[in-house]
Amino acid sequence: MIVIDDFIKDQQLLDDLKNDKTFFDTKGYMWWDGWWNSPANTIKKRLIQYIWGENSPHPSVNVQGFEYWIGVYSEYEERDELPFHFDKDEYWYNQTKEIVTPVIGTVFYPWENDIDGGYREIYPHGQDGEPERLEPKYNRLVIFPAGAHPHRVTKVTRGTRRAIAINLWDKVPSGLEVGELFLEN
């Protein structure tokens, strides 16, 4: 696992993230085939390119693209926590019961989170082991094997927790073909 605080050094990108009032409005899972195939024409794609392009703290990986989504958890929202899970191609799993996982997972916190709870807990030794517990801290980047280790978000009891999750795939997830992932414009 890699955890880097104050990851983004580009002040313009940080300001653009802070000022984009619609960043967390997008519901559902998105797909981008990467800057080598199509332009980074949205703020989310610019963020992905910043993290996984020239600023990547992780060794280079060969991928087909990026699955990404927004996580908003609050005592006032539909969801106040995220239960134990590991990331996988959900559509493929539901069709075949075969588990296909991403190459690596990413979580980034682009806004301040004045909250109680909402910790990301990663269980590298299984759900019964001790978790690695991470506070949802502004401008923090977390890179971890999202398909290998169970993880969750603990209950938010005050405030709203906001993050973007990004999975890197060496094969396009099957959900794209059936509309479970969409292309962000």
What are these regions (language model features)?
Residues 1-141, 148-185:
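Fe(II)/2-oxoglutarate oxygenase catalytic core
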